[in-house]
């Protein structure tokens, strides 16, 4: 089995899993309990939080642990909207945002909020000039992903953050799910950050929100002591310790892992470019971990099924999008309906091997020849 869908989910690193299992055995007590085992768990929790904060260059009291990116993004959208609605009801999202941001934002329109999408420039980045024109005095939230999950294009987060400093009541959020462990991170100009450990070899069902001290939220989940006022519930210490380990490995090994992936990226793209009916959608602003391409006049679902039957796992688009929906980003770059409805995504890892790449290219060649000969 060849797995080329690491942007959807990654396997849990053995070191991370060991930390999680051991913590479940050794530190299962409630960190809020006053007895000796509770105090030991609290000590481990504080140590892990301090470590996570240092790795991300934020403050310990700016960490909010959640059940995953979907909860985190819902907390961001609904929590900010309901806290700052007296200052305005205008929300700006990039055209690249995950459904866990788009859906709650859309639901807020029923409460009188206005949601607009920021256009992209010719390179697939948020158009800064368009953003400048769209920001209003009543804009309370701007959300732009750090790295889009379809083409892997790195967005100008720092530049946007600088721009938004001029607007006192406008909060800036980024979903950094695809960025951790892949590009250098700097959240100094961002107010809220979503982090998803299952994208960097951590546990599924675990999430993190960085909320800067000056930002306030209306919580979604209330009742019960936690590490913060903004998200109730007993802290899941084993998951938090596992998150710390996953972050450690992702950040410390980033350069080495990226070198491995860059090699495989070049192998795949150079070969795909030799096929006349293939169009590479990813560009020079994309991370090496994601390759998006279209096979003209080919149903992307058929291609994914063909690969799956040959024990190769990849995606037609992001896992959370409807299967028949065209890619907004591919269309923004190519202005082609065909390319936007036939795009597929390969996402790589340091765990990928040269043998796996060779096998994928072999199977792809078979598919292409069958397509040209009308057998598909």
Where are the regions a protein language model picked out?
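Pyridoxal 5′-phosphate
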Residues: 1-376
């Amino acid at each position: 089995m060849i797995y080329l869908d690491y942007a959807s989910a990654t396997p849990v690193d053995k070191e991370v899993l060991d930390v999680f299992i051991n913590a479940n055995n050794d530190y299962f007590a409630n960190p809020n309990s006053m007895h000796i085992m509770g105090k030991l768990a609290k000590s481990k929790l504080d140590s892990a939080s301090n470590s996570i904060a240092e790795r991300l260059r934020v403050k310990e009291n700016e960490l909010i642990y959640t059940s995953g990116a979907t909860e985190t993004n819902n907390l961001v959208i609904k929590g900010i909207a309901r806290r700052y609605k007296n200052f305005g009801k205008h929300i700006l999202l990039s055209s690249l945002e995950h459904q866990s941001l788009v859906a709650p934002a859309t639901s807020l329109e029923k409460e009188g909020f206005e949601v607009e999408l920021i256009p992209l420039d010719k390179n697939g980045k948020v158009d800064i000039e368009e953003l400048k024109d769209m920001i209003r005095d009543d804009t309370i939230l701007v959300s732009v992903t750090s790295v889009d999950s379809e083409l892997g294009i790195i967005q100008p987060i720092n530049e946007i953050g600088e721009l938004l400093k001029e607007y006192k009541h406008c909060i800036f959020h980024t979903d950094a799910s695809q960025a951790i462990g892949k590009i250098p991170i700097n959240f100094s100009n961002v107010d809220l950050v979503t982090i998803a450990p299952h994208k960097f070899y951590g546990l599924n069902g675990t999430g993190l929100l960085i909320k800067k001290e000056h930002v306030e939220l209306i919580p979604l989940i209330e009742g019960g002591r936690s590490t913060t006022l903004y998200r109730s519930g007993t802290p899941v210490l084993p998951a938090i310790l596992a998150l710390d380990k996953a972050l450690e490995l992702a950040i410390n090994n980033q350069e080495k892992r990226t070198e491995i992936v860059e090699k495989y990226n070049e192998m795949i793209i150079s070969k795909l470019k030799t096929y006349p009916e293939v169009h590479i959608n990813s560009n020079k602003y994309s991370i090496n971990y994601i390759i998006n391409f279209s096979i003209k006049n080919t149903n992307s679902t058929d291609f994914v099924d063909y690969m799956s039957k040959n024990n190769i796992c990849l995606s037609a688009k992001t896992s959370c999008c409807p299967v028949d929906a065209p890619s907004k980003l591919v269309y923004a770059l190519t202005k082609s309906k065909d390319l936007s409805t036939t795009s597929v995504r390969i996402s790589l890892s340091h765990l990928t091997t040269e043998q796996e790449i060779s096998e994928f290219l072999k199977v792809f060649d078979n598919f292409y020849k069958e397509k040209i000969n009308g057998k598909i």
